[in-house]
Amino acid sequence: MKRNIFKTILLSACILQGGSALAQQEKAEPGKFSPTWESLSQYEVPEWFRNAKFGIWAHWGPQCQPEAGDWYGRGMYEEGGAAYKWHLEHYGHPSEFGFKDVINEWKAEKWNPERLVALFKKTGARYFFAMGNHHDNMDLWDSKYQSWNSVNMGPKRNVLGEWEKAARKNKLPFGVSIHSSHAWTWYETAQGADKKGPYAGISYDARVVTKEDGKGKWWEGYDPQELYVQNHALSGHAWVAWDWPEGTSVPPQSYYDNFFDRTVDMINKYHPDLVYFDDSVLPFWPINDTGLKVVSHYYNQNMKLHKGNLNAVVFGKKLEAKHKEAIVWDVEKGVPSECQDKAWQTCSCLGTWHYNRSAYEDNWYKSAETVIHMLIDIVSKNGNLLLSVPMKGNGTIDDKEEKILEDIAAWMEVNGEGIFDTRPWCIYGEGPSTETAIPLDGAGFNEGKNAPYTSADIRFVKKGKYLY
Protein backbone atom coordinates (compact mmCIF):
# COMPACT_ATOMS: atom_id res chain seq x y z
CA MET A 1 0.00 0.00 0.00
CA LYS A 2 2.80 2.47 0.87
CA ARG A 3 4.40 1.78 -2.52
CA ASN A 4 1.08 2.50 -4.28
CA ILE A 5 0.62 5.77 -2.40
CA PHE A 6 4.18 6.87 -3.27
CA LYS A 7 3.64 6.02 -6.94
CA THR A 8 0.39 7.98 -6.99
CA ILE A 9 2.08 11.08 -5.57
CA LEU A 10 4.94 10.75 -8.06
CA LEU A 11 2.57 10.33 -10.99
CA SER A 12 0.49 13.31 -9.90
CA ALA A 13 3.61 15.44 -9.73
CA CYS A 14 4.64 14.35 -13.22
CA ILE A 15 1.25 15.10 -14.71
CA LEU A 16 1.17 18.55 -13.13
CA GLN A 17 4.70 19.28 -14.26
CA GLY A 18 4.01 18.20 -17.84
CA GLY A 19 0.42 19.38 -18.16
CA SER A 20 1.25 22.75 -19.72
CA ALA A 21 4.22 21.54 -21.75
CA LEU A 22 2.22 19.94 -24.57
CA ALA A 23 0.65 22.81 -26.48
CA GLN A 24 -1.86 22.28 -29.26
CA GLN A 25 -0.06 20.87 -32.31
CA GLU A 26 -2.66 20.80 -35.10
CA LYS A 27 -3.60 24.01 -36.91
CA ALA A 28 -7.21 25.03 -37.44
CA GLU A 29 -8.36 25.46 -41.04
CA PRO A 30 -9.20 29.14 -41.70
CA GLY A 31 -12.32 30.06 -43.62
CA LYS A 32 -15.92 31.16 -43.35
CA PHE A 33 -16.49 29.78 -39.85
CA SER A 34 -14.88 30.83 -36.60
CA PRO A 35 -15.27 29.10 -33.21
CA THR A 36 -18.32 31.02 -31.95
CA TRP A 37 -21.99 30.11 -31.91
CA GLU A 38 -22.76 33.26 -33.88
CA SER A 39 -20.40 32.26 -36.68
CA LEU A 40 -21.45 28.60 -36.70
CA SER A 41 -25.11 29.65 -36.96
CA GLN A 42 -24.45 30.27 -40.67
CA TYR A 43 -24.65 26.49 -41.05
CA GLU A 44 -27.34 24.86 -43.19
CA VAL A 45 -28.03 21.13 -43.10
CA PRO A 46 -27.11 19.59 -46.48
CA GLU A 47 -29.95 18.16 -48.53
CA TRP A 48 -28.23 14.80 -48.88
CA PHE A 49 -28.60 14.23 -45.13
CA ARG A 50 -32.26 15.23 -45.13
CA ASN A 51 -32.83 12.76 -47.98
CA ALA A 52 -30.87 9.89 -46.40
CA LYS A 53 -33.18 9.12 -43.44
CA PHE A 54 -31.46 5.91 -42.32
CA GLY A 55 -27.90 5.16 -41.26
CA ILE A 56 -26.20 2.17 -39.63
CA TRP A 57 -23.51 2.47 -36.97
CA ALA A 58 -20.70 0.06 -36.08
CA HIS A 59 -20.37 1.09 -32.42
CA TRP A 60 -17.41 -1.24 -32.06
CA GLY A 61 -14.22 -1.21 -30.05
CA PRO A 62 -12.33 -3.05 -27.29
CA GLN A 63 -15.28 -2.95 -24.87
CA CYS A 64 -17.06 -5.41 -27.19
CA GLN A 65 -14.42 -8.06 -26.49
CA PRO A 66 -15.88 -9.30 -23.16
CA GLU A 67 -19.40 -9.45 -24.73
CA ALA A 68 -20.70 -8.09 -21.43
CA GLY A 69 -22.51 -4.92 -22.50
CA ASP A 70 -22.10 -1.20 -22.13
CA TRP A 71 -19.47 0.77 -20.25
CA TYR A 72 -17.45 -2.31 -19.41
CA GLY A 73 -14.26 -0.28 -19.01
CA ARG A 74 -15.90 1.71 -16.23
CA GLY A 75 -18.07 -0.99 -14.68
CA MET A 76 -15.21 -3.46 -14.23
CA TYR A 77 -13.83 -1.10 -11.56
CA GLU A 78 -17.13 -0.88 -9.64
CA GLU A 79 -16.85 -3.41 -6.83
CA GLY A 80 -19.78 -5.83 -6.71
CA GLY A 81 -21.30 -4.76 -10.03
CA ALA A 82 -22.10 -7.08 -12.93
CA ALA A 83 -19.06 -6.10 -15.02
CA TYR A 84 -16.76 -6.37 -11.98
CA LYS A 85 -18.03 -9.89 -11.24
CA TRP A 86 -17.68 -10.92 -14.89
CA HIS A 87 -14.15 -9.52 -14.93
CA LEU A 88 -13.11 -11.42 -11.80
CA GLU A 89 -14.40 -14.67 -13.26
CA HIS A 90 -12.88 -14.32 -16.73
CA TYR A 91 -9.79 -12.10 -16.36
CA GLY A 92 -8.92 -11.68 -12.71
CA HIS A 93 -8.82 -8.74 -10.33
CA PRO A 94 -8.69 -5.21 -11.83
CA SER A 95 -5.64 -4.36 -9.75
CA GLU A 96 -3.77 -7.00 -11.77
CA PHE A 97 -5.66 -7.16 -15.07
CA GLY A 98 -6.99 -3.74 -15.98
CA PHE A 99 -8.81 -2.40 -18.99
CA LYS A 100 -5.46 -1.84 -20.69
CA ASP A 101 -5.15 -5.63 -20.70
CA VAL A 102 -8.65 -6.09 -22.14
CA ILE A 103 -7.39 -4.07 -25.11
CA ASN A 104 -4.73 -6.73 -25.68
CA GLU A 105 -7.43 -9.43 -25.78
CA TRP A 106 -9.23 -7.66 -28.64
CA LYS A 107 -7.91 -9.08 -31.94
CA ALA A 108 -10.82 -8.57 -34.40
CA GLU A 109 -9.73 -11.82 -36.03
CA LYS A 110 -12.89 -12.31 -38.13
CA TRP A 111 -13.57 -8.69 -39.06
CA ASN A 112 -14.45 -8.09 -42.71
CA PRO A 113 -15.41 -4.42 -43.07
CA GLU A 114 -16.26 -4.65 -46.77
CA ARG A 115 -18.78 -7.44 -46.19
CA LEU A 116 -20.41 -5.64 -43.28
CA VAL A 117 -20.74 -2.26 -44.99
CA ALA A 118 -22.17 -3.94 -48.10
CA LEU A 119 -24.69 -5.74 -45.86
CA PHE A 120 -25.66 -2.48 -44.16
CA LYS A 121 -26.17 -0.82 -47.53
CA LYS A 122 -28.34 -3.73 -48.67
CA THR A 123 -30.40 -3.27 -45.49
CA GLY A 124 -31.23 0.25 -46.64
CA ALA A 125 -28.63 2.42 -44.93
CA ARG A 126 -27.88 5.64 -46.78
CA TYR A 127 -24.92 6.51 -44.56
CA PHE A 128 -22.52 4.54 -42.38
CA PHE A 129 -20.95 5.40 -39.03
CA ALA A 130 -17.86 3.93 -37.37
CA MET A 131 -16.63 4.64 -33.87
CA GLY A 132 -13.40 6.64 -33.69
CA ASN A 133 -12.95 6.24 -29.94
CA HIS A 134 -15.11 5.68 -26.90
CA HIS A 135 -14.90 6.85 -23.29
CA ASP A 136 -12.21 4.17 -22.84
CA ASN A 137 -9.87 6.63 -24.62
CA MET A 138 -8.40 4.24 -27.21
CA ASP A 139 -8.17 5.73 -30.72
CA LEU A 140 -9.19 3.33 -33.49
CA TRP A 141 -6.92 4.76 -36.16
CA ASP A 142 -3.22 5.49 -36.69
CA SER A 143 -3.44 8.32 -34.19
CA LYS A 144 -0.56 10.79 -33.99
CA TYR A 145 -1.53 11.92 -30.50
CA GLN A 146 -2.69 8.76 -28.70
CA SER A 147 -0.25 5.86 -28.69
CA TRP A 148 -2.97 3.61 -27.26
CA ASN A 149 -4.50 3.03 -30.67
CA SER A 150 -5.68 0.09 -32.76
CA VAL A 151 -2.62 0.14 -35.03
CA ASN A 152 -0.17 -0.21 -32.15
CA MET A 153 -2.12 -2.77 -30.12
CA GLY A 154 -5.25 -4.91 -30.00
CA PRO A 155 -6.12 -5.85 -33.60
CA LYS A 156 -3.08 -3.92 -34.89
CA ARG A 157 -5.21 -2.67 -37.77
CA ASN A 158 -6.30 0.79 -38.82
CA VAL A 159 -9.92 0.21 -37.91
CA LEU A 160 -11.19 3.62 -38.95
CA GLY A 161 -9.15 3.60 -42.14
CA GLU A 162 -10.55 0.23 -43.21
CA TRP A 163 -14.13 1.28 -42.39
CA GLU A 164 -13.64 4.46 -44.40
CA LYS A 165 -12.34 2.54 -47.40
CA ALA A 166 -15.33 0.16 -47.28
CA ALA A 167 -17.81 3.03 -46.99
CA ARG A 168 -16.29 4.87 -49.96
CA LYS A 169 -16.30 1.66 -52.02
CA ASN A 170 -20.03 1.29 -51.32
CA LYS A 171 -20.62 4.99 -52.04
CA LEU A 172 -22.01 5.65 -48.57
CA PRO A 173 -21.33 8.90 -46.69
CA PHE A 174 -18.89 8.10 -43.89
CA GLY A 175 -19.42 9.18 -40.29
CA VAL A 176 -17.19 8.97 -37.22
CA SER A 177 -18.31 9.11 -33.59
CA ILE A 178 -16.02 10.67 -30.97
CA HIS A 179 -16.61 9.95 -27.27
CA SER A 180 -13.23 10.47 -25.60
CA SER A 181 -13.80 13.85 -23.95
CA HIS A 182 -15.38 12.02 -21.01
CA ALA A 183 -12.45 9.69 -20.29
CA TRP A 184 -11.38 12.20 -17.63
CA THR A 185 -14.43 11.45 -15.47
CA TRP A 186 -15.59 8.11 -16.91
CA TYR A 187 -12.49 6.25 -15.72
CA GLU A 188 -12.67 7.71 -12.21
CA THR A 189 -13.96 4.38 -10.85
CA ALA A 190 -10.52 3.02 -11.74
CA GLN A 191 -8.93 5.30 -9.13
CA GLY A 192 -10.47 3.19 -6.39
CA ALA A 193 -9.88 -0.09 -4.61
CA ASP A 194 -12.02 -2.87 -3.20
CA LYS A 195 -13.48 -2.06 0.20
CA LYS A 196 -13.75 -5.67 1.31
CA GLY A 197 -12.46 -9.13 0.52
CA PRO A 198 -8.92 -10.36 -0.19
CA TYR A 199 -8.05 -7.32 -2.34
CA ALA A 200 -9.38 -4.69 0.08
CA GLY A 201 -7.32 -1.50 -0.09
CA ILE A 202 -5.22 -2.58 -3.09
CA SER A 203 -5.45 0.11 -5.76
CA TYR A 204 -6.87 -0.74 -9.16
CA ASP A 205 -4.31 -0.46 -11.93
CA ALA A 206 -5.37 2.84 -13.48
CA ARG A 207 -4.13 5.12 -10.71
CA VAL A 208 -0.81 3.54 -9.87
CA VAL A 209 0.62 1.63 -12.84
CA THR A 210 3.48 3.37 -14.67
CA LYS A 211 5.29 3.08 -17.96
CA GLU A 212 8.21 1.53 -16.10
CA ASP A 213 5.93 -1.24 -14.81
CA GLY A 214 5.49 -2.45 -18.39
CA LYS A 215 9.04 -3.70 -18.75
CA GLY A 216 8.89 -7.27 -20.08
CA LYS A 217 5.11 -7.12 -20.51
CA TRP A 218 2.99 -6.86 -23.67
CA TRP A 219 2.58 -3.10 -23.16
CA GLU A 220 6.28 -2.34 -22.71
CA GLY A 221 7.04 1.17 -23.93
CA TYR A 222 3.49 2.47 -23.47
CA ASP A 223 2.34 4.65 -20.58
CA PRO A 224 -0.99 3.50 -19.07
CA GLN A 225 -1.52 7.00 -17.74
CA GLU A 226 -1.93 8.20 -21.34
CA LEU A 227 -4.90 5.85 -21.58
CA TYR A 228 -6.48 6.26 -18.15
CA VAL A 229 -5.75 9.98 -17.46
CA GLN A 230 -6.61 9.46 -13.78
CA ASN A 231 -3.94 11.37 -11.88
CA HIS A 232 -6.38 14.03 -10.75
CA ALA A 233 -8.91 14.72 -8.01
CA LEU A 234 -12.19 12.83 -8.15
CA SER A 235 -15.28 14.65 -9.33
CA GLY A 236 -17.67 15.98 -6.72
CA HIS A 237 -20.70 13.76 -7.02
CA ALA A 238 -20.11 10.57 -8.91
CA TRP A 239 -21.75 10.12 -12.30
CA VAL A 240 -23.90 13.23 -11.98
CA ALA A 241 -20.69 14.70 -13.40
CA TRP A 242 -21.49 13.89 -17.04
CA ASP A 243 -22.16 17.52 -17.98
CA TRP A 244 -19.40 20.03 -17.47
CA PRO A 245 -19.00 21.52 -14.88
CA GLU A 246 -21.61 19.62 -12.83
CA GLY A 247 -19.29 18.71 -9.99
CA THR A 248 -16.55 17.54 -12.35
CA SER A 249 -12.85 17.63 -11.72
CA VAL A 250 -11.85 20.19 -14.36
CA PRO A 251 -9.10 19.08 -16.78
CA PRO A 252 -5.97 21.13 -17.50
CA GLN A 253 -5.43 22.88 -20.85
CA SER A 254 -3.21 20.03 -22.01
CA TYR A 255 -6.22 17.68 -21.92
CA TYR A 256 -8.26 19.99 -24.16
CA ASP A 257 -5.31 20.42 -26.52
CA ASN A 258 -4.84 16.67 -26.81
CA PHE A 259 -8.53 16.21 -27.62
CA PHE A 260 -8.32 18.90 -30.30
CA ASP A 261 -5.20 17.38 -31.84
CA ARG A 262 -6.58 13.84 -31.88
CA THR A 263 -9.92 14.85 -33.38
CA VAL A 264 -8.43 17.17 -35.99
CA ASP A 265 -5.89 14.48 -36.89
CA MET A 266 -8.80 12.11 -37.55
CA ILE A 267 -10.69 14.71 -39.61
CA ASN A 268 -7.63 15.57 -41.68
CA LYS A 269 -6.86 11.93 -42.46
CA TYR A 270 -10.32 10.50 -43.17
CA HIS A 271 -12.45 13.51 -44.17
CA PRO A 272 -15.67 12.16 -42.65
CA ASP A 273 -18.98 13.40 -43.99
CA LEU A 274 -20.50 13.32 -40.51
CA VAL A 275 -19.05 13.68 -37.00
CA TYR A 276 -20.99 12.66 -33.89
CA PHE A 277 -19.98 13.97 -30.47
CA ASP A 278 -21.29 11.99 -27.51
CA ASP A 279 -21.56 15.18 -25.50
CA SER A 280 -24.11 17.59 -24.15
CA VAL A 281 -23.91 20.25 -26.89
CA LEU A 282 -20.18 19.87 -27.73
CA PRO A 283 -17.07 18.47 -26.01
CA PHE A 284 -16.28 20.42 -22.82
CA TRP A 285 -19.06 22.94 -23.36
CA PRO A 286 -19.55 25.32 -21.55
CA ILE A 287 -16.26 25.31 -19.62
CA ASN A 288 -14.05 25.39 -22.72
CA ASP A 289 -14.36 26.23 -26.43
CA THR A 290 -12.38 23.25 -27.78
CA GLY A 291 -15.52 21.73 -29.30
CA LEU A 292 -16.30 24.97 -31.14
CA LYS A 293 -12.75 25.05 -32.50
CA VAL A 294 -13.03 21.50 -33.82
CA VAL A 295 -16.37 22.20 -35.52
CA SER A 296 -15.21 25.42 -37.18
CA HIS A 297 -12.09 23.62 -38.46
CA TYR A 298 -14.23 20.77 -39.78
CA TYR A 299 -16.72 23.03 -41.55
CA ASN A 300 -13.98 25.13 -43.14
CA GLN A 301 -12.04 22.09 -44.29
CA ASN A 302 -15.17 20.45 -45.68
CA MET A 303 -15.98 23.57 -47.70
CA LYS A 304 -12.43 23.60 -49.05
CA LEU A 305 -12.77 19.97 -50.14
CA HIS A 306 -16.16 20.59 -51.80
CA LYS A 307 -15.37 23.78 -53.74
CA GLY A 308 -17.12 26.12 -51.34
CA ASN A 309 -20.10 23.88 -50.53
CA LEU A 310 -20.61 22.67 -46.98
CA ASN A 311 -21.68 19.01 -47.05
CA ALA A 312 -20.74 18.10 -43.46
CA VAL A 313 -22.99 17.21 -40.53
CA VAL A 314 -22.08 17.51 -36.83
CA PHE A 315 -24.22 16.08 -34.02
CA GLY A 316 -24.56 17.09 -30.38
CA LYS A 317 -27.05 16.34 -27.59
CA LYS A 318 -29.30 18.39 -25.31
CA LEU A 319 -29.22 21.37 -27.65
CA GLU A 320 -30.84 24.74 -27.04
CA ALA A 321 -32.38 26.69 -29.93
CA LYS A 322 -29.19 28.63 -30.70
CA HIS A 323 -27.15 25.42 -30.85
CA LYS A 324 -29.58 23.90 -33.36
CA GLU A 325 -28.66 26.71 -35.76
CA ALA A 326 -25.05 25.49 -35.77
CA ILE A 327 -25.14 21.68 -35.46
CA VAL A 328 -27.73 18.89 -35.71
CA TRP A 329 -29.63 17.69 -32.66
CA ASP A 330 -29.09 14.04 -31.76
CA VAL A 331 -31.59 12.30 -29.48
CA GLU A 332 -30.25 9.15 -27.83
CA LYS A 333 -32.74 6.29 -27.59
CA GLY A 334 -35.70 8.60 -27.87
CA VAL A 335 -38.00 10.59 -30.14
CA PRO A 336 -39.54 14.03 -29.58
CA SER A 337 -43.32 14.05 -29.43
CA GLU A 338 -43.75 16.65 -32.20
CA CYS A 339 -42.40 17.32 -35.68
CA GLN A 340 -39.25 19.46 -35.63
CA ASP A 341 -38.57 22.49 -37.82
CA LYS A 342 -34.94 21.49 -38.32
CA ALA A 343 -33.46 18.16 -39.35
CA TRP A 344 -32.47 15.98 -36.39
CA GLN A 345 -31.46 12.40 -35.64
CA THR A 346 -32.29 9.59 -33.24
CA CYS A 347 -29.46 7.20 -32.39
CA SER A 348 -30.47 3.82 -31.04
CA CYS A 349 -29.31 0.21 -31.12
CA LEU A 350 -30.65 -3.28 -31.69
CA GLY A 351 -29.44 -4.37 -28.25
CA THR A 352 -26.87 -2.58 -26.10
CA TRP A 353 -24.31 -0.19 -27.55
CA HIS A 354 -21.48 -2.63 -26.89
CA TYR A 355 -22.07 -6.28 -27.70
CA ASN A 356 -23.83 -8.18 -24.91
CA ARG A 357 -24.12 -11.94 -25.22
CA SER A 358 -27.19 -11.98 -22.98
CA ALA A 359 -29.10 -9.91 -25.57
CA TYR A 360 -28.57 -12.80 -27.96
CA GLU A 361 -29.18 -15.62 -25.50
CA ASP A 362 -32.26 -14.03 -23.89
CA ASN A 363 -33.75 -12.73 -27.16
CA TRP A 364 -34.08 -9.05 -26.32
CA TYR A 365 -32.96 -7.48 -29.56
CA LYS A 366 -35.36 -5.03 -31.17
CA SER A 367 -37.34 -6.77 -33.88
CA ALA A 368 -37.32 -5.57 -37.47
CA GLU A 369 -40.92 -4.46 -36.91
CA THR A 370 -39.89 -2.30 -33.94
CA VAL A 371 -37.07 -0.68 -35.91
CA ILE A 372 -39.39 0.01 -38.87
CA HIS A 373 -42.05 1.56 -36.61
CA MET A 374 -39.38 3.78 -35.05
CA LEU A 375 -38.08 4.81 -38.46
CA ILE A 376 -41.54 5.71 -39.78
CA ASP A 377 -42.32 7.83 -36.71
CA ILE A 378 -38.92 9.57 -36.80
CA VAL A 379 -39.09 10.36 -40.53
CA SER A 380 -42.61 11.81 -40.16
CA LYS A 381 -41.15 14.25 -37.61
CA ASN A 382 -38.33 15.43 -39.93
CA GLY A 383 -35.70 13.14 -38.43
CA ASN A 384 -33.23 10.42 -39.37
CA LEU A 385 -32.54 7.13 -37.58
CA LEU A 386 -28.97 6.01 -36.90
CA LEU A 387 -29.17 2.34 -35.88
CA SER A 388 -26.30 0.61 -34.10
CA VAL A 389 -25.84 -3.08 -34.88
CA PRO A 390 -23.72 -4.48 -32.01
CA MET A 391 -20.59 -6.34 -33.09
CA LYS A 392 -18.63 -9.02 -31.27
CA GLY A 393 -15.02 -8.41 -30.41
CA ASN A 394 -13.99 -10.76 -33.22
CA GLY A 395 -15.56 -8.37 -35.75
CA THR A 396 -18.75 -10.26 -36.64
CA ILE A 397 -22.45 -9.83 -36.00
CA ASP A 398 -24.55 -12.78 -34.87
CA ASP A 399 -27.16 -14.73 -36.84
CA LYS A 400 -30.12 -13.09 -35.09
CA GLU A 401 -28.85 -9.64 -36.06
CA GLU A 402 -28.35 -10.84 -39.63
CA LYS A 403 -31.99 -11.97 -39.73
CA ILE A 404 -33.24 -8.63 -38.39
CA LEU A 405 -31.27 -6.79 -41.07
CA GLU A 406 -32.61 -9.16 -43.73
CA ASP A 407 -36.18 -8.39 -42.64
CA ILE A 408 -35.56 -4.63 -42.65
CA ALA A 409 -34.08 -4.92 -46.15
CA ALA A 410 -37.17 -6.79 -47.40
CA TRP A 411 -39.46 -4.07 -46.04
CA MET A 412 -37.29 -1.28 -47.49
CA GLU A 413 -37.37 -2.87 -50.92
CA VAL A 414 -41.16 -2.50 -51.01
CA ASN A 415 -41.69 0.65 -48.93
CA GLY A 416 -38.48 2.67 -49.22
CA GLU A 417 -40.02 5.25 -51.55
CA GLY A 418 -42.15 6.44 -48.63
CA ILE A 419 -39.03 6.93 -46.50
CA PHE A 420 -36.15 8.25 -48.60
CA ASP A 421 -36.13 11.79 -50.05
CA THR A 422 -39.36 12.69 -48.22
CA ARG A 423 -40.26 15.76 -46.17
CA PRO A 424 -42.76 16.28 -43.34
CA TRP A 425 -46.39 17.02 -44.17
CA CYS A 426 -48.53 19.63 -42.38
CA ILE A 427 -49.22 17.08 -39.62
CA TYR A 428 -46.92 14.20 -38.75
CA GLY A 429 -49.57 11.66 -37.82
CA GLU A 430 -52.74 10.60 -36.11
CA GLY A 431 -53.96 7.78 -33.91
CA PRO A 432 -53.66 6.70 -30.26
CA SER A 433 -49.88 7.17 -30.08
CA THR A 434 -50.21 10.88 -30.92
CA GLU A 435 -52.58 11.61 -28.05
CA THR A 436 -50.05 11.34 -25.21
CA ALA A 437 -46.71 13.17 -25.24
CA ILE A 438 -43.85 11.19 -23.71
CA PRO A 439 -41.25 13.77 -22.57
CA LEU A 440 -37.58 13.32 -23.30
CA ASP A 441 -35.32 12.56 -20.34
CA GLY A 442 -32.13 14.55 -20.69
CA ALA A 443 -30.44 13.51 -23.93
CA GLY A 444 -33.46 11.40 -24.97
CA PHE A 445 -34.28 8.07 -23.32
CA ASN A 446 -38.04 7.89 -23.80
CA GLU A 447 -37.70 4.86 -26.06
CA GLY A 448 -40.22 2.11 -25.32
CA LYS A 449 -42.29 4.25 -22.95
CA ASN A 450 -45.11 4.79 -25.42
CA ALA A 451 -47.94 2.30 -25.90
CA PRO A 452 -47.38 -0.21 -28.73
CA TYR A 453 -48.39 1.02 -32.18
CA THR A 454 -51.64 -0.28 -33.63
CA SER A 455 -53.25 -0.24 -37.07
CA ALA A 456 -54.96 3.00 -36.01
CA ASP A 457 -51.60 4.80 -35.82
CA ILE A 458 -50.80 6.61 -39.06
CA ARG A 459 -47.79 8.70 -40.09
CA PHE A 460 -47.56 11.09 -43.04
CA VAL A 461 -44.75 12.36 -45.27
CA LYS A 462 -44.67 14.04 -48.65
CA LYS A 463 -42.46 13.85 -51.71
CA GLY A 464 -43.13 16.40 -54.43
CA LYS A 465 -46.87 16.27 -55.16
CA TYR A 466 -47.33 12.89 -53.48
CA LEU A 467 -48.51 12.20 -49.94
CA TYR A 468 -47.49 8.97 -48.21
Model-derived regions: residue spans:
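Bacterial Sec-dependent N-terminal signal peptides
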Residues: 1-26
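Mature catalytic domains of secreted/periplasmic carbohydrate-active enzymes
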Residues: 24-468
